[in-house]
Every structure is written in structure tokens, then in C-alpha cells.
Regions:
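A conserved short coil-to-beta-strand element within the FAD-binding core of flavoproteins
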Residues: 103-112
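Short, well-ordered coil/turn residues at beta-beta hairpins
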Residues: 11, 131-132
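Glycine-rich dinucleotide-binding loop and its adjacent helix/turn
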Residues: 132-208
Length: 221
């Protein structure tokens, strides 16, 4: 093929565009996506956005609009705090420059570097932080299921479970029995069960003084 001026310029332009593409991406704003808006995910999103001074685009994907802290939730059971005291909105993160997407992350394409959303669409990223927290696996404990948590609330995740547990305490008959099972080691918050039963004891002392408390604990100490 004869390389005339028009062909040469066209080929040169295409080559320039190909070489320039990585540079354009490198010069663009880096994108960090955080999945999970609990204490870990929200803290990571906040400080990346804050410390980068807007030079990093941060997106937080979290389905709920209010995060209720499990820490201090025992004070609600004991009557020292209101439920609203445990709730935190995501407005503060937005004011720090975090793009908050209230949806479920349902998949990650590691090759395309995108996070699929339950509501449709996807969010692109350059770096991804996974901080979804913990949850129960249905059927993992013999004799217990996710449906049973409505009758026997664990309140390991603050929010509706915490409210249900307190409502059950309030509806206990005078002289009734409160039973709690402490988990075996290892688990996430070692003092948690004992903080909780102490707050339950305080509540019952004030409101149901003849009630009994039974703690089943598999740990020797």
C-alpha cells in the first residue's frame, strides 16, 4: 500500500490516541469504592476523602440510611440511652465529599473493576475496600434458624433486634426468667455478653425485682 499524506496522518492520529489513553486515565481522579457503611467502612471512606482533599473520588455503597452502633447498645437495654442515640446518618460522610449510594452490592467484576448494584447498574473503581460486617449463616447452629431470631433475639446487630430484645424484657411477667447463652471463644467482642447481662440485671432490678437471670456460658473463665 502506498503511504500517502492522508494515510500517514490517519495512522499517526490513531497511534497517538492509543498511546494517550493510559495517560488520560492516569491523569483522571482515582476512584475508591467501599462496600459496607458500618464503623470500618464509614471510617475508611471518610478519611480517604478527607485526607486526599478531593484528589480521590470515594463512593460508599450501603443499603441502609441509618447505622445503629452495636457498641453502647447495651446502654439502651439498660435504660441509659435512647435508640436515636445509637443511630448515625450518612450526611456527615457526604459533607466530607463521599458519594453515598444506598443500595446492595451484589457482585464484583474484578477484571472490569466494577461493583454491580441490586437496583441495576454498576459502580467503577480503581481500588476496592470490602467492609460488609458479619451476619448469621442460616442453619449454622443446630436447632436455630434466621426465623428464630424473632422469638429469640440475639441483638448482635443493633437496630430492630435491639428494640425487640428490650420489648421482650419490658413484657416479662413479674418473677419471670431471663436466659442468655454466651458464645464460646473466639468471638468479636469478649466483654459483650457480660455488659449485656449487667444492663439486663439493672433493668430488672428497677422494673422486675423478683425476676431471675440464667447465663449459660461454655467458657471456663
Amino acid at each position: 500500500m502506498t503511504l500517502n499524506r492522508r494515510t500517514f496522518l490517519g495512522t499517526a492520529a490513531a497511534a497517538s490516541a492509543t498511546l494517550a489513553a493510559p495517560m488520560v486515565k492516569a491523569q483522571g481522579t482515582p476512584r475508591v469504592v467501599v462496600i459496607g457503611g458500618g464503623a470500618g467502612g464509614a471510617t475508611a471512606a471518610r478519611y480517604i476523602a478527607k485526607d486526599s482533599k478531593g484528589e480521590v473520588g470515594v463512593t460508599l455503597i450501603e443499603p441502609t440510611r441509618t447505622y445503629y452502633t452495636c457498641f453502647f447498645s447495651n446502654l439502651y437495654i439498660g435504660g441509659f440511652k435512647e435508640m436515636n442515640d445509637l443511630g448515625h446518618s450518612y450526611g456527615g460522610l457526604a459533607s466530607n465529599g463521599v458519594n453515598v449510594v444506598h443500595d446492595w452490592a451484589v457482585g464484583v467484576d474484578r477484571d472490569a473493576k466494577t461493583v454491580a448494584l441490586a437496583g441495576g447498574g454498576s459502580v467503577p473503581y480503581d481500588k476496592l475496600i470490602l467492609s460488609p460486617g458479619i451476619d448469621f449463616v442460616d442453619g449454622s447452629v443446630p436447632g436455630w434458624s434466621l426465623a428464630a431470631q424473632n422469638a429469640m433475639p440475639h441483638a448482635y446487630k443493633a437496630g430492630s433486634q435491639t428494640e425487640l430484645l428490650k420489648a421482650q424484657l419490658e413484657s416479662m411477667p413479674q418473677g419471670g426468667t431471663f436466659a442468655m447463652v454466651a458464645p464460646p471463644n473466639p468471638y468479636r467482642c469478649p466483654p459483650g455478653p457480660y455488659e449485656r447481662v449487667s444492663m439486663v440485671a439493672h433493668y430488672l432490678k428497677e422494673n422486675n425485682p423478683t425476676a431471675k437471670i440464667i447465663v449459660a456460658d461454655p467458657k471456663p473463665k
